[in-house]
Amino acid sequence: MERSGGNGAGARAGAPSEGAAKGSSLLSAKSTEGATGRFSQSTPRPTGMDGFLKSDERQRLAKERREEREKCLAAREQQILEKQKRAKLQYEKQIEERWRKLEEQRQREDQKRAAVEEKRKQKLREEEERLEAMMRRSLERTQQLELKKKCSWAGSAASGPGGRDGESENTPPLPLTLAASIPPSDTGTATAAAESTNACDKLSTSTMNLPKQTEPPMSKHLSSSIVAISYSPDRALRSPLKSSYKSSPTRTTEKKKNTLLSGVGDAGKGAMTGGEPSQMEKVKKGRGATSVSSGGLGSPLRRCEPPENISKRSSSPVKSKVTAKTYPQSPKTVKPTYIGSPVKYYFPPTPSEETLKKKAEKEKSNKEKEGATGRQTTVLPREETLEKPMADKDATEKYVADKHATEKHSATGGKAEHSAGKSTAGTTDAGEAAKILAEKRRQARLQKEQEEQERLEKEEQERLEKEELKRKAEEERLRIEKQEEEKKQQEEEEKRKAEEKAKEKAEEELLSKEEQEKEKQEKEKKEKAMIEKQIQAEKEAAEAKAQDAAKQMRLEREQIMLQIEQERLERKKRIDEIMKRTRKSDASLEVKKEDPKVEIQPLPDVENKIKPVVPNKIEINVLNTCQKVNVSERAAPETFPQDIFSNGLKPVGGPVHPDVLDGKSNSLDDSTEEVQSMDVSPVSKEELISIPEFSPVSEMIPGMSLDQNGTGNARALQDILDFTGPPAFPKKSSENLSLDDCNKNLIEGFNSPGQETTLNTFC
């Protein structure tokens, strides 16, 4: 700002060099100074530069705002992604928790089911043990009873031995265990036992290839006993879930019973070495015992079988058929039945003569021995003789018994035979011992195979049970999933139905509201129309009433105006008469001297024209009168009150022809103004008296004289005072009153405001 001219020139000279050096950079400070020095020294920076700087600043700020917005958007997207991730994790966690709960619930149900099953099995085992104990007790009782019966039968059998020869031919041979346990008394019996064992060995190897149709003759005889065994209470109380080949607790008890009974049999056999009954007697007694025992097996706890029969209840082909018919199992619990090794059927050999002779000799020798040793025998030999028929009866049932029970019983029988062989030293030879050993080995091998088969079947059964449990669990899981899906679909369907119902309800409410609004609007329109009609009717009635009232008022006003006009005319007439009377005495002489010629326009047919509208027909030519008559100064006040009075009492417009009245009143006003503006010159009394008497009444009724009124001056003044009220000016004495003063008083009295207001009220 303090630069000199040289400095300014130097600055102006240096500006182009700086601009050339920096390439016309408008954003630098030096170029800005050169540009400003070029134009003016007082402005340091042009407005254009400020605009550029502002635009750069705006761009920078806009860029910063964009960057901040992008950062905010990126942060928001990151938050949204994190939220979605958390929601997904939460959802997965909820799903896992739900699956875990379902799995735990399924496990609990499985455990509960297994516990219930185990409890049921335990209860069944306890029930079986209880029933077995009851059966053992009942067996003991029945054995005691049978022993008593057989004791009585033994005496009768000894008296007639020959009658049973025919029956002995049809009796089957003894089984292997029974034949081995009975020591032969002589070589004949030993050979018979050897033959029977050989036959058993042959049959055991050949029965694998036997057809199913080939049944031994004994099967018919044993059908009744088999049916009775199949309906035994022990079999009826078994669980349907147990298969025929499973090892149940009953089999363990059967083994114990077999060992117990084998010991009893061994004791009996040891005591029988001295002498035993013949084979025919045993078969006969066995048949009798079989019939008795089979007859007592109808009810669950009737005559129970001996322990040998209980141990032989297993799944043979014949019994499986009977039980399948008797106890049909459900498809769920049916399991593959185990078909054991075929039963050894013993075909009875045809009796020959040699065997018959041997039997007869054997009977004789037995009788002799019985007679010798009859005294020495005690209760024990009797029990042995009673148990022999029981053993024979059991032998008949062993033909159709299960292989497993037969093997176990044969093993125990082998042990008993071995002990019996030891007790009866020298009763068996080496061949028979070898056969017995071979039979034992074969039975051990079969037992091992049976155990292996049972183990495999047990494993297979366990595997099947596991698969069944898995399948059930999978079905349960699928069922639960299906139920959940159906429940979810049902909830969605219910929700959708509820939404549809709500929507329909809202639409119905909206429609009802719209209908209500329409009805309301229509009702309001109707009410409004009715109100408008009522208002219109009332308005028309009011207008009619107003018109009637206005008409009535107009008529009344017309009547009043007519009355007022008549009164005014009468007053005017009286005033004129009064004025005439007051002037008459003084101006009678002057009037006689001067006979002024006043042109009075007569109004013909005044009587015809004065009807309801009288004031409109009055014509007062005051102006013409004033122009024609040269009045003096004294005469002007006398005529002025007449004009003022006529002007002040002009009628109100209305139905009484207001145009005519206005015209007349205007003419009167003009005349009044002209009268007031005239230069009144003083006149003499003669001239005043010579002014003709003028009044509207005299114009209307020219033939009427003032004296016809019949009223005096006093009465006229009294009437004026009554009408106009008391004067507003001080009353002057008659002594000091001149003619001029009288006229003045009259003018002031009639022009007072009280009079005009009174007159206006009438109008």
Swiss-Prot record:
Compositionally biased tracts (Polar residues): 184-212, 241-251
Tissues expressing the protein? Detected only in the brain and testis (at the protein level).
What GO molecular-function term can you cite, just one? kinesin binding
Q: Which residues form the signal peptide?
A: none
An example of a Gene Ontology BP annotation on this entry?
A: microtubule cytoskeleton organization
Q: Does the keyword Coiled coil apply?
A: yes
- Give compartment(s): Cytoplasm, Cytoskeleton, Microtubule organizing center, Centrosome; Cytoplasm, Cytoskeleton; Cell projection, Axon
Q: Which GO terms describe its cellular component?
A: axon; centrosome; microtubule; microtubule cytoskeleton; midbody
Q: Which InterPro entries match?
A: MAP7_domain-containing, MAP7_fam
Q: Which spans of this chain does the record mark as coiled coil?
A: 434-575
User: What keywords sit in the KW lines?
Assistant: Cell projection, Coiled coil, Cytoplasm, Cytoskeleton
In this chain, the stretch annotated as Disordered covers 1-72, 102-127, 140-531
**One Pfam family in the UniProt entry:** MAP7
Keyword Transferase attributed: no
Q: Where is the composition biased (Basic and acidic residues)?
A: 53-72, 354-372, 381-420, 437-531
The Low complexity compositionally biased stretches are 12-31, 312-321
Q: Where is the composition biased (Gly residues)?
A: 1-11
Main subcellular location: cytoplasm
Q: How does it assemble?
A: Interacts (via N-terminus) with microtubules; facilitates microtubule stabilization. Interacts with kinesin-1 family members, KIF5A, KIF5B and KIF5C.
Its family remark reads: Belongs to the MAP7 family.
What is the recorded name of this protein?
MAP7 domain-containing protein 2
Taxonomic source organism: Rattus norvegicus
Gene this chain is encoded by:
Map7d2
